[in-house]
Structures are given as structure tokens and as C-alpha cells.
Amino acid sequence: MLTVEIHDSQVSVKERSGVSQKSGKPYTIREQEAYIDLGGVYPALFNFNLEDGQQPYPAGKYRLHPASFKINNFGQVAVGRVLLESVK
């Protein structure tokens, strides 16, 4: 099980926006950061996208929901949209 931890200082949304060079349409990327325990000595800091209007996850411990994983075009397991489940 991959454990994700969000600290109080990470309960915020970072937004980046611009205009797509290909389509000319405006876009906004909403991200939150957290730490994930990959089994090493220290957890790794990572960013994950939030949906438009989605509130940031509160501080706490989580695990990746199984729906976060998908099979890509090459038949390999990959992480898609990150969905977190609270660990109690």
C-alpha cells in the first residue's frame, strides 16, 4: 500500500494558467503537494492535479485509491488521476 501524507502547510492549491500554443484556448492547472512513501529512507515530495472547483485534501494520511491506476497504451500499469482515500 502506498501511503500519502499531507501536512498542514500543504493544504492549499497552486494554480498555473496560460493559453495553449496548439489550440489557443486558455487553461488552468490546479495542483496540491504531498509526500508519498515509496519504501525508501525518506518520503518523496510530489504534486498531483485537482479537478476544477475541487477543494484541497485536508492534512492527514491517505492511500492511493485503486481507481488512480490504469493500463496505458503499451499495456503497462500507470498512475492516472490521483484519488486519495483517508487512512484511519
From Swiss-Prot:
One GO term in the molecular function aspect is: single-stranded DNA binding
- Which is a Pfam family this sequence falls into? Phage_DNA_bind
| Gene3D superfamilies, alphabetized | Nucleic acid-binding proteins
**Origin: domain of life:** Viruses
BP terms from Gene Ontology: DNA replication
Asked if DNA-binding is a keyword of the record, the answer is yes
> Which InterPro entries does this chain map to?
NA-bd_OB-fold, Phage_M13_G5P_DNA-bd
Which controlled-vocabulary keywords does the entry list?
A: DNA replication, DNA-binding
Presence of the UniProt keyword DNA-binding in the record: yes
Quaternary structure per UniProt? Homodimer.
The entry's function note states: Binds to DNA in a highly cooperative manner without pronounced sequence specificity. During synthesis of the single-stranded (progeny) viral DNA, prevents the conversion into the double-stranded replicative form. G5P is displaced by the capsid protein G8P during phage assembly on the inner bacterial membrane.
The family classification in the record reads:
Belongs to the inovirus G5P protein family.
- What protein is this chain from? DNA-Binding protein G5P
Taxonomic path: Viruses, Monodnaviria, Loebvirae, Hofneiviricota, Faserviricetes
